[in-house]
Design a protein with these regions (language model features):
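Residue-level marker for buried hydrophobic side chains located in beta-strands
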Residues: 2-4, 39-41, 115, 201
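Catalytic core of the metallo-beta-lactamase
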Residues: 12, 114-122
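Active-site-proximal loop/helix segment associated with metal-binding centers of metalloenzymes
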Residues: 119-183
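Residue-level preference for short coil/turn positions at secondary-structure junctions
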Residues: 35, 73, 110-112, 196, ...
Length: 246
């Protein structure tokens, strides 16, 4: 089986809340490891993540240990970064055996082709400020300045504050199926350019939803909390099903 999850936002909220969310996520990793051939983490697993040459953020040891355990057992884990953890470098790969991917990824399961993306920087051509911020935060120059000029304690505190500010700015928004339309439109355009693709799978929107139309399925993964999370599972034939974990 193939499993997909996103938007756990480990480290969000106060320490007890973050710890409960992490334990919930680790229980899910335990459960799916029973029959998983591969696990795809589709961005924003961490609320903020930044790596220096010798320094990584404090915490998340249960998650990191579990990921290392799973890859040691031969389970493939692929981490497609999101807008909150785009500055991942090689730590997760070297220490935990996780394959880190900074762009979208296309896989084939059976006769179906599935395109996987976090979804944060798609279909934003009419939003110049968002495009500018996206380019800036993904800039290698900014990453090097951040890592070379700012002490890790200050950098991580700032990053956690910024991530929390960004998340809270959307906290009162009501997400509906209509909120997903810009990514549905993107998926339709992608299908036209890549007719072999049968399904697109996104995170980012914090709203689990499955949209199906002729020759195209679109799955949105949803997010995680202290006691539950949504995820997708696919068999070897590429059939996608959204599920809830408690």
């Amino acid at each position: 089986m193939y499993y997909f999850a996103s938007d756990v936002h480990l480290g969000a909220g106060d320490e007890p809340t973050s710890r409960r969310t992490e334990r919930c996520f680790v229980r899910w990793l335990d459960m799916v490891s029973a029959d998983a051939e591969a696990i795809f983490l589709v961005g924003d697993i961490f609320d903020f993540w930044f790596e220096y040459g010798k320094v990584v953020p404090k915490g998340f040891v249960r998650t990191l240990g579990k990921l290392a355990e799973l890859t040691d057992r031969g389970i493939k884990v692929v981490f497609i970064t999101g807008n909150h953890d785009m500055w991942s470098r090689d730590y997760l790969q070297k220490e935990c055996g996780v394959k880190v991917v900074h762009t979208s990824r296309t896989i084939t399961l059976g006769k179906r082709t599935i395109h996987i993306a976090h979804g944060d920087n798609l279909n934003i051509g009419d939003k110049p400020l968002l495009r500018l911020m996206n380019s800036a935060f993904r800039s290698n120059i900014l990453r090097k300045l951040f890592s070379n000029l700012i002490h890790p304690d200050l950098a991580l505190c700032f990053g956690q504050w910024w991530s929390g500010k960004s998340r809270k700015s959307h906290a009162n928004e009501t997400i509906t199926p209509q909120s997903l339309q810009f990514l549905i439109d993107y998926a339709r355009g992608y299908k036209q350019q890549h007719p072999d693709v049968d399904c697109l799978l996104f995170g980012h929107m914090h709203y689990p939803h499955f949209h199906s139309e002729e020759n195209l399925d679109i799955a949105f993964l949803g997010n995680w909390s202290e006691s539950e999370g949504s995820y997708a599972v696919s068999d070897g034939e590429g059939n996608i099903e959204l599920k809830n974990f408690r």
